[in-house]
Amino acid sequence: MDTNFWLERWQLGHTGFHQQEVLPLLQKHWHALDLPKEARVLVPLCGKTLDMHWLAAQGHRVLGVELSPLAVTQFFDEAGLQPQRHSSAAGEHFIAGPIEIICGDAFALDASALADCTAVYDRAALVALPAELRQHYLQTVYAPLPTHCHGLLITLEYPQAEKAGPPFSVDATHVHALFDSAWQVDQLEHRDILDQEPRFRDEGVTGLSTAVYRLQGR
């Protein structure tokens, strides 16, 4: 899986992963992080998720990172926003009010771009990556975050042999294997969602659940 895979999906409109509303699990569990309003929240592989607007409405500053210029443009256009723009080594920056999106490769981020992020919201990033890329993703995106950073991680679990990702199945054992060395991991919720995801059932998936984790940097 390379950058062209994701760029092509946006160009062709193959974006079934994009939700048309704010994720209810975010609204339900975000306050468990107990963040100050002024906290800056990193949203890796953000696409054009409406969750960023919700986070901004809570008083947070939001930093999204997205590879596709089309996704970034659509995010601001659909909100009727005209962002200011500038370039850096990390990519092209789009800024409107409390929301900033860096259009660039998350795997090429400079640590300085994340220096003032005190929280991370990962709904569609970790599950978008095959197993062989996840450790590198943590080293690139999570490791540079400040000590005692907070996070909300949302994953999917299903029999991986029944469906090719993305999104990929990331079960609790794998979450702990990835995060336990640097993060305290607490599962906040785990529930079956197969009835709410007919596209998975149509592809022959026999079981599907989602899990929500609170992360606390050590």
UniProtKB/Swiss-Prot annotation:
Principal subcellular localisation of the protein: cytoplasm
Location of the protein in the cell: Cytoplasm
Biological process terms in GO annotation: methylation; response to metal ion
Molecular function as annotated in GO: thiopurine S-methyltransferase activity
Superkingdom in the source lineage: Bacteria
Enzyme Commission number(s) of this protein: 2.1.1.67
Residues engaged in binding S-adenosyl-L-methionine: 10, 45, 66, 123
Coiled-coil segments on the chain, per record: none
Family (UniProt): Belongs to the class I-like SAM-binding methyltransferase superfamily. TPMT family.
Protein name: Thiopurine S-methyltransferase
